[in-house]
């Protein structure tokens, strides 16, 4: 007799990673949230970290442009890279892996004109307003020094059939509280959703995964795990061991599905990337911000992700000592014909006796 499959989304490679098909890892101690007003019914998350607990596309695309269009090579900081910089440098996700209809990005002078252009394009493409553009000052004219790198990614995916709303239930952990959370899924009429729910594997009550198919080509994949590994490593293992083989089970009358509603917002200030000299460029990052909003319910998933980087070019590469070729001390002077092997004049200046007084 088949075991009942009672699927609970107890952990996550959630839609933040799954809508784009990749994952990332992060420096858990350095990412800090900056103040904002959380929207109604949205949980403002402060204890999850980029690259450890979630993956998002916008800042990666900004970083890619910073690497390719500003620095011209892999980003390296003097004194070594923060862990998060090394992860961004891997460029696991590029714009070629995404549909152009899902994102807008630009690299431009940090001017009022650029700000207005971005606002116009966001309204035209996504009917959205930026939450980041007002966080920095904008120049009236291009000074040739300050540039802005910006990206917004927005995507909504919908289930072919709306899942049933189920009675609220607790979220099971080692310290399960008495709080109940909104749930959706399938408890009966399994045949109605058999083409929408694709079990990837089922190895017992605490080890299973499912794919939730959408109207588009996107898949929302949920698996149970208590692993402390970064989300990227969890994804790589899942893809290598299961998804790449395209094997699956059947969602039948003995199967049940239970998934929590998710609604959160995260704002990040990448302080560990700002104000630090680069070893291979005369550019300094002044601002590095990101906003992530994600929701999952019985109709589908929505992700809105915005990132912005402000950079400036310094007169000299900050890592190079200034070179003072000052001959106001003992020196020798030679004059020769071009490429001559012997100078036709030479003078040793040991003291100021040959110098002209000012």
Where are these regions (language model features)?
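Bacterial N-terminal signal peptides that target proteins for export
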Residues: 1-9
């Amino acid at each position: 007799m088949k075991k009942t499959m009672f699927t609970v989304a107890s952990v996550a490679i959630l839609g933040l990673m799954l809508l784009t098909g990749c994952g990332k890892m992060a420096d858990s101690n350095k990412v800090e949230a900056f103040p904002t007003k959380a929207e109604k019914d949205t949980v403002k998350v402060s204890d999850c970290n980029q690259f450890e607990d979630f993956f998002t596309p916008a800042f990666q695309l900004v970083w890619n442009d910073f690497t390719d269009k500003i620095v011209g090579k892999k980003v390296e900081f003097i004194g070594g890279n923060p862990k998060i910089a090394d992860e961004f440098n891997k460029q696991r996700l590029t714009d070629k892996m995404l549909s152009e209809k899902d994102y807008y990005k630009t690299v431009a002078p940090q001017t009022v004109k650029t700000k207005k252009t971005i606002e116009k394009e966001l309204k035209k493409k996504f009917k959205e307003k930026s939450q980041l553009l007002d966080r920095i000052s904008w120049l009236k004219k291009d000074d040739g020094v300050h540039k802005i790198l910006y990206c917004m990614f927005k995507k909504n995916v919908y289930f072919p059939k709306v899942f049933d709303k189920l009675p609220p239930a607790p979220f099971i952990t080692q310290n399960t509280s008495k709080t109940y959370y909104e749930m959706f899924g399938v408890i009966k009429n399994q045949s109605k959703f058999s083409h929408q729910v694709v079990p990837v594997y089922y190895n017992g009550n605490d080890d299973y995964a499912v794919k939730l198919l959408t109207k588009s080509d996107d898949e929302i994949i949920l698996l149970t795990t208590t692993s402390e590994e970064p989300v990227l490593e969890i994804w790589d293992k899942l893809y290598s061991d299961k998804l790449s083989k395209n094997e699956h089970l059947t969602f039948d009358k003995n199967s049940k599905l239970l998934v929590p509603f998710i609604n959160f917002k995260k704002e990040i200030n990448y302080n560990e990337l700002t104000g630090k000299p680069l070893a291979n460029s005369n550019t300094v990052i002044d601002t590095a911000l990101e906003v992530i909003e994600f929701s999952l319910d019985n109709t589908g998933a929505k992700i809105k992700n915005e990132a912005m980087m402000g950079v400036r070019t310094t007169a000299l590469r900050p890592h190079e000592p200034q070179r003072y070729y000052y001959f106001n001390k003992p020196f020798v002077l030679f004059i020769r014909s071009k490429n001559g092997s012997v100078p036709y004049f030479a003078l040793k200046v040991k003291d100021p006796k040959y110098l002209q007084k000012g």
